Amino acid sequence: VLGGVLRLREVTADPASALPLASAAPIGVHIVAMSVFCCLGAFQFSPALRNRRSWHRRAGRVLIPAGLFAALSAAWLAVVFSGPTEELASAMVRLVFAVAMAGVLVQAVIAIKRRDFAAHAAWMTRAYAIAVSGGTQALVFTLWTLTFGEVDASGETWLVAAGFVINSFVAELLIRRRTAGPMNG
């Protein structure tokens, strides 16, 4: 969230870095929507709040649209990518995960409409894992830079992908643990 706020400030404050409206508006939408999704979504993992059905339902009615706006604006930014050619692969990785996030949010809505609460929780966990991958990417970049030095464009692509994959893997572990129930023995 802090990174998004700083990026939004950078885009709006510096006339030299003025982006065309085709990019500036989606960046603003993405940062605001993703911030809402990540902050409000964190509270959905609290059993005490999740068990308060009216709160959980109202929060979900904000989270789903925020998540879809975040995912679709990220997809838009990847499709209309206007950065250096060597960064195109990184944009395509982001596109894949933006589309995946939108898809899992749709699956979460379908699951809750069927009153399949376990599937809904699993799909929302996957969406949240993708959404908060920026933090994991920052950690991976920092560890890489401290260990091996600066990252080139090719390395950036792999590190961005690593952040998404790490979060997705952890989400699947949490989902399996949740559905497996307590271990006997």
Language-model segments: which ranges?
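Alpha-helical membrane insertion/targeting regions
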Residues: V1-G185
